[in-house]
Amino acid sequence: MFSIYHCRHLPIVALLLLLSALPPAAAAPAEPTLSIAEARTRPVGTKVTVEGVVSSPSGDFASSFSDEGFGLQDRSAGLYVSLKDNLKLAPPARVRVTGVIEDHTGLLALVPTNPADVIRLGPGRPIMPRAVKTADIGEATEGRIVRVAGKLSQAPESDGAYGFKFWVNDGSGAALIFVNTQTGITMGRLPSVGARVSVTGFSSQYDTHYEIDPRSPADIAIGK
C-alpha cells in the first residue's frame, strides 16, 4: 500500500506524479430534483428539491401566513414556499428551491433553510388558472392557481388585521375566498349578494377548511 511516509526518498517530481494519479475524493451527491407532485407525497420532515414557476408574489399572503413566502407551481402540482425573507419574486419567475416539507396548519409548505436555497433560473411561462367547481376546492387543488365563477352567496366578513372573507357558489357548494390585506383588494370593491363574480387565486388551506386566496384586484372580476 502506498503511504506518504514511504515517499520521503522519492524525487519530488515522481511524488507529484504519483499523488496526481490517486483517485479524487468523492463529491457529495446532488439533491435530485423532484416534480412538485412527487414532493407533495414525501413525509413531513423530508428534504426535497423542486423547480417551478412562481405563482403568487412574495409576501402576498403575509397577513394570514405570517411570512414572506410565495406560491410555486409546475405542470404536475403546486405548493407554498415559506420564507421569513421577502425575495421580491413575482410570476412568472422560474426558480429551483431546496427545503424541508412541513405542515403549516393544514397547508403543505416547502421551507428552505435560508434564502440562498432559492435559486433564480430566469423567466418561466405564465401559469394558466385551472377552472374548477366551487365545491371542488380541496386537497386535490391545494397549491395550484385556480379559478371559480358563481354568485356571491354571503356578505363579506372582516377578519381584522388578517383581511376579510366571502363566499362564491356556482350551485355545487360554496367556496371560501380569503383576501389578505397585502393584495390591495377592499371589501367595497365587491358587489351585493347574488351578483356574479369570478375569482382566481392560490388554492390554500387553513386548519380544516379550504379556501382560495386572490393575489391582486385583477383576480376578482365582477359580473363574470
Positions of the model-derived regions?
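Compositionally biased non-globular segments, especially hydrophobic aliphatic-rich helices
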Residues: 17, 24, 28-30
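Position-driven detector of the extreme protein N-terminus
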Residues: 2, 20-23
